[in-house]
Structure formats: structure tokens, C-alpha cells
Amino acid sequence: MSTPQTGVRSVHSGPVIALDAMGGDHGPQEAVRGAVRAVREHGLRVVMVGRRPELVRLLAEEDAAGAIPIVHAEDALAMHEGALASWRRPRSSVAVACKLIRQGEASALVSAGSTGGVVATSTVRLRTQQGIMRPALAVSLPTRPGPTVLLDAGANADAKPEMLVQFAHLGAAYARSAFGVENPRVAMLTIGAEPGKGNRLARKTAELLTAAAAQAPQAQRLDFRGNVEGHDLLAGEVDVVVTDGFTGNVALKSVEGAVRFTMDAVAEAMTSSTAAKAGSLLQRKALRELRGRLDSDTYGGAVLLGLNGSVVISHGASRGPAVERACRLAHDLTAGGIGEEVRSRVQSGARSARRQRLGPGGEEQPAG
């Protein structure tokens, strides 16, 4: 089966992953390494989008000349560029990858580029699902019972209460589809667990979520458990944590920093003396397993929910293995029908949320 616009035959089957090969702190070299791993080790179908001459050279250096199709894109988003870049750079690698999805030539986009630029470009070119105001970045946090979905993790610095209710439906649908949680427990991230805590946005959102939990039809009902605080994110007591993108991104970066500090401190303590070094030999396997569970690269990246297409945004500092995991995540979203199932589930939830915010006369109520 040949991939459109490339002429290169693929021996693999399954969805095509459009990889933005120009995004990320480390440039196309790590993207190429990740793509080669994804194809060789997992049989994924990947098409790299970027500057063809550079990608051809890098593929040859990996002994993979001609192994992965390339779609040329002459431009690229810089890591410092934000939302306006989506308009200024219509020929960027992200924009070209979105075009492949829109034309049915790819099923998902993976990028390690600027979060603001990727979110804006994919939103403009793929459009939001019917009834969805804005997409949300969903990150799976590792906990003992199972992953907790945090959203929004950075797509929308400012949000309205109605948007956060939609994010709750998106997150619950994702938890059901991706992790098999039959009735996801949803909570609001704020400064206190007691009802009424938080700013006006948090209080109004909690009010709407409480109403949705009580009044919506059973099939569309959210299991809203109230508020959680930052120290609850890794407790595993809820399945979905909802917040605005500013708060969510700060919370995510704080968790990543705390995990990194803890792992470094443990490693330092285990090698601080001869006795500790001897003991560390026994603990090394357990430490590697713990690092693997908590490493932000383990889950591949954040999933941009709410668009007409699957988008995975990996960490800007992603190396080859992280890019490969992001490609695997994008493959699972599409091959497993997770993306379509989320879209289907959230449509009914979006309609329910809209009914919740309409008054008796069918007029929009103020956000508070």
C-alpha cells in the first residue's frame, strides 16, 4: 500500500501517523530516530513531514534510507512561537501534517513542537468537534490504582465554566475509552477540598458539574466527586481532574519537577557511601521500575481532545525513545478506535452541558 504524495510502498498496515519531524528542542535528528524505532520495532506506519533533503540524509545515517515516507514541508514552527504562528506559517510542518489528516491521508499527528503553535495550528486546520468550544490537552498521570487524566494541561490559559464542563466530558470519555474505566470519577482542581473553595471560575464550574451529575440522563451523567487539591493528583482517588490550562500546566510541571527531584535525591542517597552503594545494587531494579512509572516520557505525550482528528503533543525535550512512544500512543488512539469513541461519547455530553446552561426560556445564562 503506497502512502499518498510519497510513492514509497509500506509493508505495514494500520493507521498512518504524520510525524512533525521539525518540532522539538533537538531538531529532526531525534524525530528520525523515534520514527525508525516505531517502524522497525512496532511495525507502525509513519510518514515524516519536514524538509526532505535533511530527512533523507538523517534516514541514511540510521541505515533506513527509503524506509519511511517523507512529505516535504519547507517551513517549521520555532519553539518560542505561539498561537499567531498558525496564521503566519501556513506551510509549516505542523500545518502540512494537519492537511494530510484533513485529506484522509493520515490518521493522527505527533509533534514535539511549541505547544501553543501546535494547538493553534491543529485547531484552525482540523476544527473542533461539533458543540465543543475549545480542545483540551489531556495528560495521563501515573497512580497506584491506574492513570488519572489531567486536563486542561496547557491548551487554554483562560477558560469559561462551560468549557471546563466540556473538558470534564472529554476527560471522562477518554478515561472510559483508553483505560476501560466504566464510570470515571471526576473532580475539580482547586485550593481546597471543601465545597465553595476556589475562585469564581472554580466555584461556577463546580456548580455546573454538580447539576450535570444530578440532572443529566444516566448515559450522559458525570460522577462528580467535588474538589481535589494539588497533593491529590497522584493519589489515584479520582480518574479525571479538570482545570483551566494555566493551572493545569503549572500543576503538571510541578509534578514533573517533584518527581525529578525525588528520583535524583534517591539516586544520590544510594551512592553516598560504600554501604549505600552495596545496598543500591539490590535496589537498582526497583529504582529503574519506579523511574519508568514516573517518567513523563512513559505515556508518550499529551492528547489534544476535542478536535476532528487525533493529535499527540510530546515534550519539547523528547529524544528518540519518547518520540517513538508518542507515535505508539497516536497509533493506539486511532487503531483502537479510541479517538472515534471519545468523539461519539462527548457529543451527547456536550448537548447535555448546553441544556444545563440554558434557562427556562432557552436563553444563555451568565457564567457567574
Describe each PLM feature range:
Residues S2-V56:
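N-terminal phosphate-binding or glycine-rich loops at protein starts, especially the Walker A/P-loop
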Residues V16-Q29, A155-V165, I313-R319:
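Short, glycine-rich nucleotide/cofactor-binding loops
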Residues D20, V49-G50, P69-V71, S111-G113, ...:
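Short beta-strand segments
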Residues Q29-E30, H42-V47, R52-P53, A157-G226, ...:
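Glycine-rich phosphate/diphosphate-binding loop of Rossmann-like nucleotide-binding domains
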Residues E62-A106:
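Phosphate/nucleotide-donor binding subsite
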Residues L100-V119, K197, A202-R291:
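Glycine-rich phosphate-binding loop
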Residues T123-L150, E237-V241, G245-L358, G368:
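Glycine-rich phosphate/nucleotide-binding loop
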